[in-house]
A protein has these predicted regions:
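Active-site adenylate/phosphate-handling loop in enzymes that bind or generate adenylated species
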Residues: 126-131, 164, 169-176, 247-248, ...
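A glycine-rich phosphate-binding loop feature that marks nucleotide/adenosyl-phosphate handling sites
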Residues: 48, 241-245, 288, 340-349
């Protein structure tokens, strides 16, 4: 009897030459971690695919989870049989029946080794004849068929599937180093974080809270965002920086039109220090060119010069509708639209500068002790840990997060 399995296809991982095995092992580990809630029997490599075997009644849900893991191009629910033609032909009938509506089909057989007595063309003909008998009202079509039945012969086994679901693609998390992301409870920064994770980066989010000048609602929403990204993208640690009092100090000391730039220079500087602690090589933000006053070219340059490490802005050329569509796709949009006062709305000027002059920015920067403020914020920084197989904690900054109430208390508070 044919067993249900998942065949995971990958594209970019397969292009990595001598490092291919390394990337495949990372992807396999990430798939195992994403399926921690499932009864997985094994995750292994077979002939350019990753094979996942599990409890059969979990097949559909497991496939949906695997699709969300960066590095996965496609997921196919397949039937696993032995080399008996009767077995794999029967599996082909089942696979095509599950495909959905179709008028035409084609069989595509592939052998990973040549010790099987039948050539690929013979398997195609053999399976095709059985399918023609099972579906007499459907036609065989060699070019652009509605359904393609794949028959993969690997060692002593045959895998048969007709339906594939697209994955998120990219590279497996943990294959491209570590970055610090500025994560708010808004729409943009969760998408930017996800996009860097999709390129293989381990993302370490830093959330600047308006506390104690605002409630800590945004801190809980950010935790919800991190949980929404899981299990496909697992974030191991969230840093929380209580920024409200420092914003108040800046609002008193600096010209009102330059407040936002000063806020962001401090945020970047703190993020850079955390990046050094974490061994991260870049900062990631959710900025999109021209979307708000702080995101003009002049203002981006004025903020960027406060740090030495690279700042990645994966959304810089995206419009709001594109960002919203992606947020809906990754499951963070509804959380991000919940009302939550945070540092982004605190002590905002009526007329923020849109084309900052560097001389004026430097003068404002010297109107308060920014170095002392950065050090103070670092000492006040707290963190929350989450389950993750890719995150490796640094040996410093061991302070826990005592201010946040347990999740159950927060739900009662709602």
């Amino acid at each position: 009897m044919a067993a249900r399995v998942c065949l995971v296809h990958y594209h970019e991982v397969g292009l990595k030459g001598k490092n291919r095995a390394h990337f495949e092992h990372i992807l396999m580990d990430n798939i195992k971690a994403a399926l921690a809630a499932f009864s997985v029997n094994a995750v292994s490599r077979i002939s350019g695919y990753i094979l996942v075997t599990f409890n059969e009644h979990q097949a559909d849900e497991a496939a949906r989870v695997i699709r969300t893991v960066p590095g996965v191009a496609r997921v196919s629910l397949a039937y696993h049989t032995n080399r008996d033609p009767q077995e794999y032909c029967a599996a082909a009938v089942k696979a095509l029946r599950e495909f959905g509506p179709f008028d035409s089909f084609k069989v595509h057989a592939k052998r990973s080794n040549t010790d099987y007595e039948l050539a690929s063309i013979d398997i195609n003909r053999q399976v095709g004849e059985v399918l023609c008998e099972a579906f007499p009202d459907k036609k065989v079509q060699m070019h652009d068929p509605d359904a393609m039945v794949h028959v993969l012969v690997v060692q002593g086994s045959v895998y048969v599937y007709a339906r594939s679901e697209r994955g998120v693609g990219g590279l497996p998390v943990g294959s491209a180093g570590k970055v610090v992301t500025l994560l708010s409870s808004g729409i943009d920064s969760p998408v930017a974080t996800w996009m860097l994770a999709r390129r293989g980066a381990v993302c370490v989010p830093v959330h600047f809270s308006g506390r104690p000048q605002t409630p800590d609602t945004s801190e809980y929403l950010v935790q919800d965002i991190i949980r929404a990204l899981a299990p496909g993208v697992q974030i191991g640690r969230l840093y929380v920086v209580p920024f409200g009092d420092c914003q108040r100090e800046i609002s008193v000391a600096c010209p009102s039109n330059l407040r936002v730039i000063m806020y962001r220079r401090i945020m970047y500087s703190v993020a850079e220090r955390i990046a050094h602690i974490e061994g991260a090589k870049a900062i990631v933000t959710g900025e999109s060119l021209g979307q708000v006053a702080s995101q003009t070219l002049e203002n981006i340059m004025a903020v960027n010069e406060a740090v030495k490490i690279p700042v990645f802005r994966p959304l810089i050329g995206s419009d709001k509708q594109e960002i919203i569509a992606r947020a809906e796709e990754i499951g963070t949009f509804d959380i991000s639209t919940e009302a939550a006062p945070d540092c982004c709305t605190l002590f905002m000027p009526r007329r923020p500068e849109t084309h900052a002059k560097l001389d004026a920015v430097h003068e404002a920067w010297e109107l308060f002790d920014h170095e002392e403020m950065i050090e103070r914020l670092l000492k006040q920084t707290e963190y929350i840990d989450f389950e993750s197989n890719t995150y490796k904690a640094p040996k410093t900054l061991k302070r826990k997060h005592p201010q946040l109430a347990p999740r159950e208390i927060y739900q009662d508070h709602e």
